[in-house]
C-alpha cells in the first residue's frame, strides 16, 4: 500500500512542497531567507492576533491600550516587543531574499519574481499601516505625510487623500480603517506566498552556479528541512535577544509621545527599513516626481528580468557585475543613512547623487555590463 502522504489529497501537496521535493544539492545559506520569511510571517500573525485581542482602534484609547498591553496583560510587553522587532527581522530577510534573487539571477523565473515584488509591496503597505496603530507622534505625522503624497496626483489627488483619510484630516476614521487593513493584509500576504511557492515549484529552485541541477537533486527532507531549522533557531535567538535586551533600539523616541496634531516632530522619518525609499522620495524637489520616484524605486525590480543581457544566469562567474551588485548594496546603505538625516546641506546633495546612482545601476550599468561580459567572452 502506498504511503498516505503520497495519496491523501491534502498531504500529497505538503509532501510535494516540503518533504519529497527535489532540491539542488548545492543551494547555499542564501536560500534560507525564503523559509525565514515564512517563519517571520507566522510569528507576526500570531503575535499580532494576541495584540489585537487587547488593542482598541480609537484615537482616544489606542495609545493607552498599548500601555495597558505592556503593563497589565500577561507577557503583553514580550508579545509587543516581538511583534515590533519581528517587523525589522521580516524586512532584513526580505532584503536578503531580494538581493539573493538579483545576485544569482533567480529573477529569470519571471512569475515567481513578479509575485515576489507584489509581496514586497504588500508587506511595505502592511508595515506602514501597522506603524500608525500605536497613535504616537511619529505614527500620526508619518500617516499624515505619506498619505498626503497621494495629493500630488493630478485632478484626483485631493479627493483621493480625503477618501483614504475618511475626512479632512488623519482622524478616528483613518485609524479604524488602518487597523482593518493591518489585520487583513497579512492573510493576503500568506495567500500570495502560496502562489509564489506554486510558481517556484513549477520550475524548481535556482542554485549558486546558475546551471541546470536536474542531474544532482536531493530530497528536501531531511537535508533542507534541517538546514531551515538551523536558520529558524538562529533567527529566533536574534529576535528574542533584541526583544528582551533592547526592544526600543530600532524604534523612534517620538512615538512614546501620544499623537498631537498641533505639534510637528522636528524630524519626520519612517522606520529604518523604509529610509532608502524615503531618501529617494526627498531627493526630488517636485512633489509628483518624488512620489513617482518612490514608486519606481520598488517597481524597478520588475524591469530586472527584462534588462538581463548576460548569457550567464547569476553573478557567480561575472566579476564586473559583482562589483556593480555590491555598489548597489553600498548605495542602498548610503540612502538608508541619508533618509534618517535632516533636509540640509550636504545631505540633500548626497541623497540626490545616491538616488541617481541607484536608478543608473538598475537601468543602465547592469544591462551594459552583462552585454560587455558577453563581448569579452566572445559570446555573441
Curated annotation (Swiss-Prot):
Sequence positions that bind a ubiquinone: 201
Name the CDD domains for this protein. cytochrome_b_C, Cytochrome_b_N
Please provide, alphabetically and separated by semicolons, the GO molecular function terms listed in this UniProt record.
Answer: metal ion binding; ubiquinol-cytochrome-c reductase activity
Transmembrane helix: present as a keyword of the record? yes
Q: What biological-process terms (Gene Ontology) are attached? A: mitochondrial electron transport, ubiquinol to cytochrome c
Enumerate the InterPro entries for this protein.
Answer: Cyt_b/b6_C, Cyt_b/b6_C_sf, Cyt_b/b6_N, Cytb/b6-like_sf, Cytochrome_b, Cytochrome_b_C_euk/bac, Cytochrome_b_N_euk/bac, Di-haem_cyt_TM
Residues the record lists as binding heme b b562:
83, 182
This protein's UniProt keywords: Electron transport, Heme, Iron, Membrane, Metal-binding, Mitochondrion, Mitochondrion inner membrane, Respiratory chain, Transmembrane, Transmembrane helix, Transport, Ubiquinone
Compartments where located: Mitochondrion inner membrane
The record's section on PROSITE patterns has: CYTB_CTER, CYTB_NTER
Segments passing through the bilayer: 33-53, 77-98, 113-133, 178-198, 226-246, 288-308, 320-340, 347-367
Q: Cite the cofactor comment.
A: Binds 2 heme b groups non-covalently.
Q: Which cofactor does it need?
A: heme b
Q: Where does heme b b566 bind?
A: 97, 196
GO CC annotations?
A: mitochondrial inner membrane; respiratory chain complex III
Which PANTHER family is this protein grouped with?
CYTOCHROME B
Q: What does this protein do?
A: Component of the ubiquinol-cytochrome c reductase complex (complex III or cytochrome b-c1 complex) that is part of the mitochondrial respiratory chain. The b-c1 complex mediates electron transfer from ubiquinol to cytochrome c. Contributes to the generation of a proton gradient across the mitochondrial membrane that is then used for ATP synthesis.
Q: Which family does it belong to?
A: Belongs to the cytochrome b family.
Return the protein name.
Answer: Cytochrome b
Q: Which organism is it from?
A: Polyodon spathula (North American paddlefish)
